[in-house]
Amino acid sequence: MKTNKKSFSYLLFFLLLLVFLALFAFLGIRSFYRANYMPEPCTESADELSNPYIGFYHMYGYVLGSDSLSNLPAASDSDAKNRQGIVMLEVNLQNFSNEDLSDSALSQLDTILSAWQRHGSQVILRFLYDWDGKAMETEPQSLEQILRHMDQTAEVVNRYTDCVFLMQGIFVGNCGEMNNSHYMSDEDCTTLMHHLAEVTDPSVFLSVRTPVQRRKILDSSERPTKETAFDGSLSSRLGLFNDGMLGTANDTGTYGDTAASADTYRSAWVREDELSFQNELCNFVPNGGEVTLDNPLNDLAHAIQDLSRMHVSYLNSEHDPAVLDKWKAAAYKDKASVFNGLSGYDYIERHLGYRYVIQDTALDSSDFQIRLENVGFSVCYRKLDLQLTLVSSDGEVFSFPISSDSRFWIPGTTAELSISLPLARLAKGSYTVYFQMTDPVLQREILPANTFSHDTHGFSIGTLEISKLY
């Protein structure tokens, strides 16, 4: 009997020991260290940010088959100070209207894209046959020849997907703007766009001149959703370029006079309905172009409102000078804003595309949290890599990836980022906390609109003190 009691005592002791060890393992992190996080002030900045894929672009034109190429960026201009961000390249194929592009012409195209790739720019690319409003005279005499040119140019373009961000149009129309062409029937437009999508890399965005052209090509008014966006399909790639932006009530022929409905998607809708369409669509595909014709629609307050609804991420820096100069002469007025007193042009420049403001950072137990707001007109259509880094006072570096799809950081909304940190495994001491956003395609760091100090680890957002209690 005594033996049984003794065995029972041993068993009870063993079970209690297991419970104690389990509690120790479960509560150890909470019980044997203390973490104190001190955030840096999240002060918003009104500075211009040199971030990719967005902003006012400069335009450069090239004629394939010409004796020489001019306007190529010099190798010495590739440093950050001289580098242009987003640029538009118009490549004229009129010398080969009725024949295949020569090897020499394709080599010239390669030279052009290679130069801008080395320059570190992001390219909006438009192929065309006309710069003088005479497309019907200079375009190929057969649709098959245009399709062949798409095949040939795509072989070169696909080598530069880290440089070519999007392509505008389907090669036809005056200045490549999909108008006054032999090939603007619904059938031809659909054939050309589907073929262009087939031969170009899925990472390159495509775009058409008007919303109704997109609806006709896809035979649908459906917009991408979070489930279908960025899946490589034509619908997920096909955005808009509007070179009549804010020019008239119908954006100089971009919109129509039909009310939106399920039965009228093949018609151009009235302005308000087309703006609502773009407000949904262009959260997932790019929209840009150029403003034109000084009028009340592009007065500063109205322009900001519509550019925001259309989610515009890029605009021509040279056209229309009357409108751009009007914005430069106007002041943005909002006493509660860091942009109060800035010129209208500068305000718009700082809101084209995405603009991330870190609102606050915090540590809840071992969960580190970052809250940021996209105050720009659009999302970033390329997914970013996100990283939190702790650097100890003696230089040890601990980096942790953050899981969040930045392509869904919709304008006007706040993104909540969270990551669990292994604080119990860190030595006691002081750590500087850094946050970094990087575009993996360009290997470019994305700058937040804050006044944080910066070094190679990213932006310093706070200090973490860890002390051990044993």
Predicted regions and their residues:
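Extracellular/luminal regions of secreted and cell-surface proteins that mediate adhesion/ECM remodeling
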Residues: 344-470
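N-terminal Sec-pathway targeting helices
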Residues: 2-20
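Catalytic-core regions of glycoside hydrolase
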Residues: 166-323
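Active-site groove signature of glycoside hydrolases
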Residues: 124-134, 153-186
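Aromatic-lined substrate-binding rim segments of carbohydrate-active enzymes
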Residues: 72-130, 143-145, 200, 204
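Boundary/entry segment of secreted carbohydrate-active catalytic domains
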Residues: 31-86, 90-92
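Catalytic cores of secreted or luminal carbohydrate-active enzymes
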Residues: 300-360
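An active-site-proximal structural segment forming one wall of the substrate-binding cleft
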Residues: 105-121, 139-166, 185-199
